[in-house]
């Protein structure tokens, strides 16, 4: 009888306090969280392990469904971005560069990515791929992963190819709504909806994002998936037949877990809402709130101690209270 192989997990970043240990592998993105000193795994952290930073305030794409709306604001200042990283870098493992527009079009995009890596924080971002420049691809090699939003346009497929040609871990972000229901379920069933325009063998994953009737999307509530569509999607996404990996945002996961029970292995990688527990969002004008979809009334000005806002402000405590009562729910009703 052959002896069992011992599996050794390698991590290059560690945070530990009296309550928990947080381990991270910056190459694979694997994160391990566990209670210490006889304590259970924590419900929430002392700071976010994933921080969504809205570096962009401007966007010329004007997508009809944009949850950010079409109001144009100044982009985040590099000095503000650096001050955030200075505060959180010991605890925060990943930052998602986002906001109202393509992060790679920020004038200091390269400096932001480099500053993250200098402080052992892994940057990731999503882009439309429009007017993607060679130097943006080069700096993207320092990111953990890049996602391209699927607009089904030539610039979408061109961006995907160029990222993959550069050896960058590349994902597709696909909105799941009433209109894209057939496309999403087809992709999961292994049907090449892109008709060869995407190199499926090199694609890392397709991440399905639940449509949010927020911002400009408030006028498009007809895109909200029906209960039947959600139930079918929930069954398909846990039994994929495609070559690439499949993922979903926590907003969609909340609904999936209402209809399906994941396997033990799936349960380890499916997260319900993490807002105010494991993640938070900072706007281009330095307002800290539990998630990027939260209304303005839940914003907290980032003019004090970030840790104090995270742990003591009413918006963050409200989110945690709701999620503690029911994990697979949305505190703002999505």
Descriptions of predicted regions:
Residues 23-24, 281:
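Hydrophobic beta-strand positions
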Residues 1-19, 27-30, 285-334:
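Flexible mid-to-C-terminal extensions adjoining Fe-S/redox cofactors in radical SAM and related proteins
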Residues 1-9, 13-15, 205-290, 333:
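A C-terminal junction/extension of Radical SAM enzymes
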Residues 60, 131, 153, 177-179, ...:
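Short, solvent-exposed loop/turn segments at secondary-structure junctions
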Residues 59, 63-66, 273, 291, ...:
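Short cysteine clusters
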């Amino acid at each position: 009888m052959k002896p069992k192989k011992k599996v050794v997990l390698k991590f290059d970043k560690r945070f530990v306090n009296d309550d928990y240990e947080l381990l991270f592998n910056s190459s694979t993105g694997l994160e391990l969280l566990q209670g210490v000193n006889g304590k259970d795994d924590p419900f929430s952290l002392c700071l976010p392990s994933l921080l969504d930073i809205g570096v962009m305030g401007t966007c010329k794409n004007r997508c009809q469904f944009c949850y950010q709306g079409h109001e144009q604001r100044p982009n985040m200042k590099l000095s503000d971005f650096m001050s955030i990283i200075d505060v959180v870098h010991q605890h925060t493992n990943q930052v998602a560069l986002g906001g109202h527009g393509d992060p790679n079009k920020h004038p200091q995009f390269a400096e932001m990515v480099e500053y993250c890596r200098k402080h052992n924080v892994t940057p990731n971002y999503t882009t439309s791929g429009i007017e993607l420049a060679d130097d943006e691809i080069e700096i993207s090699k320092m990111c953990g992963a890049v996602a391209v939003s699927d607009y089904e346009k030539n610039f979408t497929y061109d961006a995907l190819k160029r990222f993959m040609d550069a050896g960058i871990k590349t994902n597709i972000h696909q909105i799941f709504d009433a209109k894209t229901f057939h496309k999403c379920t087809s992709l999961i069933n292994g049907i090449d909806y892109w008709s060869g325009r995407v190199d499926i063998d090199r694609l890392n994953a397709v991440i399905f994002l639940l449509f949010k009737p927020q911002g400009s999307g408030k006028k498009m509530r007809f895109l909200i998936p029906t209960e039947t569509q959600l139930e079918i999607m929930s069954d398909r996404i846990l039994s994929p037949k495609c070559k690439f990996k499949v993922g979903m945002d926590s907003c969609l996961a909340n609904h999936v877990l209402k209809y399906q029970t994941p396997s033990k292995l799936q349960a380890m990688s499916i997260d319900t809402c993490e807002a105010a527990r494991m993640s938070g969002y900072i706007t281009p004008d330095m307002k800290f709130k539990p998630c990027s979809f939260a209304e303005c009334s839940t914003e907290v000005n980032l003019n004090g101690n970030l840790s104090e806002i995270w742990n003591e402000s009413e918006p963050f405590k409200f989110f945690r209270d709701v999620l503690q009562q029911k994990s697979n729910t949305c505190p703002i009703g999505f």
